[in-house]
Amino acid sequence: MNNFKLIVRKWYIPVLIISLITLVASAYALYWATIPETKETQISIRHYSALAYFSGGAEVKKDNPIWANGSFVTLPVYSYSLTPEYSGEFYFTTAPRGDITIETEAKIVYFYEVSDAPVWEKVYYAASNTSRGEIKTNFKINVTDLKSKINEAQNSFGVYLGKTGARIDVSVHYYGKITGKDVDETLSFKIPIDVQSTYYSFSTLNETRDFEMPSTRVVEVQKPLHMKVIPAALCTVSIIFAGLSVVYRTKYSDVSSLEREIERVSWEKKLKEVSFARMPETNLEMVEVERFEDISKAAEETFEHLFYDREKGVFFFIHGGVLYYCREK
């Protein structure tokens, strides 16, 4: 530690300059590391939604104890005798509403299929319509007549392995601009019709289809942790070295005073390792050791105790009939 003090004190100016330069550089690196980077990423965002609805009902055409003749009813199932005609409406638009042209082609088909594989299919009714922004297509279907067409075709075919059915097919083509962006899409919708021997029913439709568009978003990305830890550590070390250099420069204005302090501490440490005694006047062989560290190590390795003669200023020990000594430096 004392040698460290001496080095820092002797090289006060270089240590201070290097510490300050390192401090500024590491502080800048730390500041730069705390600023997140930005990058562009491609994402998809909602552009608009296509909305399609179908619902309807039937007018009662016959006196009965349930509904008044001429009333309009909406039921899960309908009777051929009471409600032979079904009135339905298909509605289409977009959200948000766009500056678009909408074209619809609608047809009512009846068919026969085996294991979901079509055998034959016939068109009962077809219509087309054009509008802007939104569109409504109305249907008025004589389901009693439709049932007769199905039975007639099936009887003509003469095979009854599969099943018969009917549906409404609607193709919607729209083009133009929505929220200022060009669109051109064609969508298809199928509305099943359940035609049974004693009743029929229509499915409803309430469908939303979302459309997305690509967008660029700028996101923040944090820099790796080591890019913050290393500059922070360098900042800390630089501050410590700069502070120590100033403290040692202030405390030890004269380098010689620090050197004397180091020598004093070193001397006190040496004295703690030895015992005091007079070096004997003897005819033993004598070996002089140059450094205290060497004689201290030799005494330790030979398991001998090291002594110090204050009057002569000599460290010594005896081993194997030989007196080893080291003069005080």
Curated annotation (Swiss-Prot):
Keyword Repeat: no
Name of one Pfam family that matches: DUF5305
GO cellular component: plasma membrane
Keyword Transmembrane helix set for record: yes
TM segment ranges: 13-35, 229-248
Compartments reported by the entry: Cell membrane
InterPro entries: DUF5305 (IPR035185)
Keywords (A to Z) from UniProt: Cell membrane, Membrane, Transmembrane, Transmembrane helix
Main localization category: membrane
Membrane topology, from the record: Multi-pass membrane protein
Name of this protein: Uncharacterized protein AF_1654
Species annotation: Archaeoglobus fulgidus (strain ATCC 49558 / DSM 4304 / JCM 9628 / NBRC 100126 / VC-16)
